[in-house]
From Swiss-Prot:
Interacts with the eIF2 complex gamma subunit tif213; the interaction is direct. The gene is cdc123. Pfam families: D123. Mg(2+) binds at residues 239, 241. Belongs to the CDC123 family. Keywords: ATP-binding, Chaperone, Cytoplasm, Magnesium, Metal-binding, Nucleotide-binding. Disruption phenotype: Inviable. It comes from Schizosaccharomyces pombe (strain 972 / ATCC 24843). ATP-dependent protein-folding chaperone for the eIF2 complex. Binds to the gamma subunit of the eIF2 complex which allows the subunit to assemble with the alpha and beta subunits. GO terms for molecular function: ATP binding; magnesium ion binding; protein folding chaperone. This is Translation initiation factor eIF2 assembly protein.
Length: 319
């Protein structure tokens, strides 16, 4: 089987496309679409800027001041729109763009969590993520039917800001599930640590995942990958991705997934085996991280204080 990726497959996997179909199967969320133009411009900027309190902003009245003016930041109306959505979702959210959650930007947090309680935290996480940058610039890479030869996203494409209600998730019961011809061919745990209880409960998890898949029968593509979180005998739909190597196969290679027969009665199940080296998560997304001196600058600071300190250090180095 030779895998082919199309533009429609990618579009079907953007959050707003499937959330409208499966709203009752997934945690509560709000979609701001189109994303405010000033937010989109901020995400495309090269530098990271943290908003200053209104009473500290000085009027730029000279050429020298203009040269040292802070980098671009979204308008107040856009900030208020995000703050309103956060409040409506209970005061804490997990942000994402059309496809990607900024999991690779956890290095900029002091909590190791995607939990955001302010618009500034939302924007800083999105701005610091290579995954989000890929959404912005290369979402249609590898699509055989996409016109732009370099895979770049059209300028008139409608990006969306997704804010998902935050709640604590135990990584041990997150699974990635692979579907071919509408059949569950395989699934595996997402976390890379061994959990003894998973094996004894795996039959129950398989049934919950299979039951959830039946409710996804209106998804337009026969082949896709979906993520679930199992909690208290319920499988929650977390995300949907294309059945294509750009989606991480985790404990499966894509050559294995391509060769699996969708007619098999039982899906292939893989868990981290006992005796595997425990993971602290420190190596995950290692290449997305930053020099040690930037991390050292964050000691004792919250997210925004850390970013402001790093901005000050960067400005001094450029003097």
């Amino acid at each position: 089987m030779t895998l082919i990726l199309t533009k429609n497959q990618v579009l079907h996997c953007q959050f707003s496309s499937w959330y409208s179909l499966f709203r009752k199967l997934t945690p509560k969320a709000k979609v701001i679409k189109p994303i405010p133009a000033t937010v989109l411009k901020y995400l495309h900027e090269d530098s990271i800027y943290v908003e200053q309190p209104m009473n500290t902003v000085e009027e730029v009245d000279s050429e020298e001041d203009e040269e040292s003016a802070p980098a671009y930041y979204p308008e107040r109306e856009a900030i208020q729109l995000i703050e309103k959505a956060i409040k409506e979702l209970g005061g804490a959210v997990v942000p994402k763009l059309n496809w990607s959650t900024p999991k690779d930007a956890l290095w900029i947090t002091t909590t190791g969590s995607l939990k955001c309680t302010t618009a500034e935290e939302v924007l800083l996480l999105l701005k610091s993520s290579d995954f989000v940058a890929h959404d912005l610039n290369h979402a249609f890479d590898d699509c055989k039917d996409f016109d732009n030869a370099d895979g770049s996203v059209p300028k008139d494409f409608s990006f969306e800001l997704v804010l998902k209600e935050w709640f604590p998730m135990h990584a041990s019961t997150e699974f990635r599930c692979f579907v071919k011809s509408k059949r569950l061919i395989a699934f595996c745990q997402r976390d890379d640590n061994y959990y003894e209880f998973l094996k004894e409960n795996i039959d129950c998890y398989e049934k919950l995942i299979s039951d959830l898949l039946k409710k996804l029968d209106t998804f337009p593509d026969p082949d896709f990958v979906f993520d679930v979180y199992i909690h208290k005998d319920r499988a929650w739909l977390i995300d949907i991705n294309p059945f294509y190597p750009r989606t991480d196969g985790l404990l499966f290679s894509w050559s294995e997934l391509e060769s699996m027969n969708s007619e098999n009665m039982k899906p292939e199940i893989r868990l981290i085996p006992k005796g595997s080296m425990p993971s602290t998560g420190s190596a995950k997304y290692y290449t997305n991280r930053v020099p040690f001196d930037m991390i050292a600058a964050s000691e004792g600071e919250n997210l925004l204080e850390f970013a402001q300190k790093w901005q000050d250090l960067t400005n001094k180095s450029n003097e």
